[in-house]
């Protein structure tokens, strides 16, 4: 069972004659260290338990019945000792919260053997730390430490002190952690002193006291092994790096052995890669980053490795490698702080390759999933530009464009484009639908009235009277100053006649006759259809008057074809 804090690493480059780098944002991986606190009669099996023993331990360990109120002190201590063993055992097999619950009943009990109290307090603090309750661990740690004030150091006390230091380290109270570790460092001996030195090294790293961190990290390494040794070496390397000794940091990272603890090993590979990158040895850096991605893909640090790797590829103009790495990165770490920037970079790569649909899909992920991103508006703007290209090639993308950006002028332009294209191809009815949709959904667009007028003319030509009425009415109602509004009124009136609404047509045509700017042709046309409208409602006298006046005007204009048309209409109207 392993856990690792989310690791965030930033690179800062300050120009001071040459590039200087600082590693920041590091966190020591949580390693569930379980100390062997000496020989306690009956405790050996408990203090050798491992995570894999959890099932057998829970099934085999049995607590005695709790003594009654009149129980003797020996009975009570025996019960509390068993309960303490059970709680420590639970923590050692990884059941931290359950272990803390059991130990909370005995942590304040005055055992006749103080060694038992040291074990209980140490594991009680570790249970709180490993379950993530750092503040409670710090609070109890302070209480325990107050009991040891001005008392001579011993190893049991040292483990409690170390655990209290760990609580402060993981809780972010680095200077306090350092001061707690100091008692073990100055007065203690053995493994607990060296673990305290390692903890102090990390506390100093967090406090940016790199020289102190380096000293503590180097002094403890001869006495540590396994994961604690690797943690000390990582601290040493980071301290050297941040003190400007990048070559020295590289040498340390190169000699760190794998531990089998994934968060620690992944951290070594990552920082080794980062160090080689700082030295401009990009191929070796990439090898280490790729190792993190391949072997530790389930850990957050692999996202950091992918982020750094794709930036190296971009710098080397290895576009395909960068693209594949970014895809890996954004698919696995959508919540990474750099995820939106990576998505935008990926979209731009696809755009440069004219793969517009893939470019659009990654831009869409930004503005659909990250509404608070600083790239939100930029991504939407870029997406509209891409849609404006692909919407002219595929009507499916046009409908997607309209759905996602219903107010986009580029979408309106694409509708006009399709209307014109279909009109040129002779597909008038399809063209009319595009023009009408454009005019209806973008009424404030400069070309909206023209689009509606074209659509209305097509409906009119094809005798689709209801559609024509609806379209021309929009123009008349919305654009009273449109340069073709009078024609729209005229076509509206005719469409109303053939749609079975002659009374409305008469109202429009009579209003049009009152215009002062009418020429004889316009007046004749209006009168002709006014006569037709009157005929439809059975007003023969008014119909004849209008048609005869139209006939005179057509004759004067030399429009003999229209004269014949009017004569035919008059033949059907009784006197």
Predicted feature descriptions by range:
Residues 2-575:
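Acidic, polar-rich low-complexity tracts and alpha-helical solenoid repeat scaffolds
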């Amino acid at each position: 069972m392993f856990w690792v804090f989310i690791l965030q690493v930033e690179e800062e480059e300050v120009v001071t004659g040459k590039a200087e780098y600082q590693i920041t944002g590091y966190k020591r991986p949580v390693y569930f260290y379980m100390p062997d606190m000496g020989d306690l009669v009956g405790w050996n099996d408990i203090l050798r338990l491992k995570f894999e023993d959890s099932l057998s331990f829970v099934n085999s360990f049995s607590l005695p019945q709790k003594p009654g109120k009149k129980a003797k002190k020996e009975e009570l201590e025996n019960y509390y000792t068993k309960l303490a063993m059970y709680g420590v055992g639970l923590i050692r097999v990884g059941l931290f919260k359950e272990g803390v619950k059991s130990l909370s009943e005995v942590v304040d009990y005055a055992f006749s053997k103080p060694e038992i109290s040291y074990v209980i307090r140490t594991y009680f603090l570790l249970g709180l730390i490993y379950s993530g309750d750092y503040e409670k661990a710090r609070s109890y740690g302070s209480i325990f430490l107050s009991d040891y004030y001005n008392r001579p150091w011993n190893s049991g006390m040292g483990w409690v002190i170390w655990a209290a230091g760990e609580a402060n380290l993981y809780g972010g109270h680095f200077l306090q952690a350092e001061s707690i570790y100091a008692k073990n460092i100055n007065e203690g001996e053995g493994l607990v002193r060296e673990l305290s030195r390692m903890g102090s090294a990390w506390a100093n790293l967090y406090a940016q006291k790199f020289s102190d961190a380096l000293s503590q990290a180097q002094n403890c390494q001869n006495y540590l092994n396994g994961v604690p040794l690797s943690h000390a070496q990582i601290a040493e390397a980071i301290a050297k790096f941040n003190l400007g000794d990048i070559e020295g940091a590289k040498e340390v990272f190169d000699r760190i052995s794998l531990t089998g603890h994934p968060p620690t090993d992944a951290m070594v590979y990552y920082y080794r890669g980062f160090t080689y990158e700082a030295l401009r040895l990009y191929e070796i850096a990439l090898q280490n980053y790729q190792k993190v991605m391949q072997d530790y893909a389930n850990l957050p640090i692999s996202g950091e490795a992918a982020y750094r790797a794709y930036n190296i590829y971009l710098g080397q103009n290895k576009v395909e490698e960068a693209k594949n790495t970014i895809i890996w990165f954004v698919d696995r770490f959508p919540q990474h702080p750099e995820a939106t920037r990576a998505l935008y970079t990926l979209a731009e790569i696809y755009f440069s390759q004219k793969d517009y649909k893939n470019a659009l899909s990654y831009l869409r992920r930004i503005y659909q999933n990250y509404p608070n991103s600083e790239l939100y508006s930029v991504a939407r703007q870029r997406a509209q530009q891409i849609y404006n290209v692909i919407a002219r090639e595929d009507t499916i993308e046009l409908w997607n464009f309209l759905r996602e950006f219903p107010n986009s002028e580029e979408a309106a332009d694409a509708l006009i484009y399709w209307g014109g294209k279909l009109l040129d191809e002779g597909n008038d009815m399809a063209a009319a639908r595009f023009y009408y949709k454009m005019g209806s959904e973008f009424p404030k667009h400069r070309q909206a009235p023209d689009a509606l007028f074209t659509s209305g003319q097509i409906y009119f030509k094809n005798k689709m009277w209801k559609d024509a009425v609806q379209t021309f009415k929009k123009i008349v109602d919305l654009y009273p100053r449109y340069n073709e509004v009078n024609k729209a009124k005229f076509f509206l009136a005719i469409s109303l006649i053939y749609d079975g609404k002659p009374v409305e047509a008469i109202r429009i045509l009579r209003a049009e006759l009152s215009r002062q700017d009418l020429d004889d042709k316009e007046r004749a046309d209006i009168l002709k259809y006014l006569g037709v409208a009157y005929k439809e409602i059975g007003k023969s006298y008014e119909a004849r008057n209008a048609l005869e006046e139209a006939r005179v005007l057509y004759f004067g204009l030399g429009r003999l074809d229209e004269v014949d048309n009017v004569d035919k209409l008059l033949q059907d109207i009784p006197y």
